[in-house]
């Protein structure tokens, strides 16, 4: 099959024809698939197991770089490879022709029959245009140790219950005997009860927190009493200071009263002086009028004497 020439130009002459494409020296790796003997070694290693290997491989085409160009390469369909290593582990995967040599090389190793190697995983050189779907059917591995969080969460309620049991299992026989004692509870014998030999009060023995609270209350009451006495002392001091204040205030009131009286007297005197001055003014004005009339009279008399 000869390589195709360039298409004819539309609307132009087809002569001279275009030169053919130059052949390639080597075909690309993704275009050529070379058969090797790895498949035989896989089959030979698995002959003892019944139906251990089931594979469907497409027909391999020997591609000559001088006969076919990369423009004429058609992508071959993928192959399905199912390898049964033992009765419990089965690998099912889909791979391309480029990943077959690595898978064959991995399966042909002698340690693949061991249980430690049966849990491995394939590593393939995946091109960008190829997608794989892996489906591994592994038996569930039992957990040797449960998670720490679950154990702690499960143990916490048990610890709480143990704490409650330890609290509820305390010995209260002495308290019960003390409460139900008739000699202590009867009012007739209450006055004849002698103080206990030990310094520890039964209430202190059974309810130490209550006694502690009572001590706190008694100390608080004593502090209140001391503050009251201090308040009384301060009140006496304040009474002395208030008497001094009242004495000074009385003095100030008397002084202000005297100053008010003096001011009122001055106001009265000024009023009287004003009235007096006003009267004097009126008198002086009347005198001025009389004097003016007299001057007029004297002038007329003088004029009469002069005319004669």
From Swiss-Prot:
Residues 266-277 have a biased composition (Basic and acidic residues). The gene is zip-2. Belongs to the bZIP family. C/EBP subfamily. GO terms for molecular function: DNA-binding transcription factor activity, RNA polymerase II-specific; RNA polymerase II cis-regulatory region sequence-specific DNA binding. Disruption phenotype: RNAi-mediated knockdown increases the proportion of aged worms with fragmented mitochondria from 5% to 59% and causes a 30% decrease in cellular ATP levels at day 8 in adult. RNAi-mediated knockdown decreases survival upon infection with P.aeruginosa. RNAi-mediated knockdown reduces induction of expression of infection response gene, irg-1, in response to P.aeruginosa. It is found in: Nucleus. The keyword Translocase does not apply. PANTHER family: CCAAT/ENHANCER BINDING PROTEIN, PROTEIN MABIKI. One of its GO terms (biological process) is positive regulation of transcription by RNA polymerase II. Its main location: nucleus. The lineage of its organism: Eukaryota, Metazoa, Ecdysozoa, Nematoda, Chromadorea. It comes from Caenorhabditis elegans. Residues 242-305 form the bZIP domain. GO terms for cellular component: nucleus. This is Transcription factor zip-2. Residues 217-277 are annotated as: Disordered. Transcription factor that binds to the promoter and the enhancer regions of target genes. May act together with the bZIP transcription factor, cebp-2. Involved in responding to mitochondrial damage. Plays a role in the delay of age-associated mitochondrial fragmentation and muscle decline. Has a protective role in response to infection by the Gram-negative bacterium P.aeruginosa. Required to prevent P.aeruginosa ToxA-mediated lethality. Induction: Induced by P.aeruginosa infection. Induced by translational inhibitors such as cycloheximide and exogenous or P.aeruginosa-derived ToxA. Residues 217-229 have a biased composition (Polar residues). Keywords: DNA-binding, Immunity, Innate immunity, Nucleus, Transcription, Transcription regulation. Residues 246-276 are annotated as: Basic motif. Signal peptide: none annotated. Expressed in the pharynx and throughout the intestine. It comes from the Eukaryota. Residues 277-291 are annotated as: Leucine-zipper.
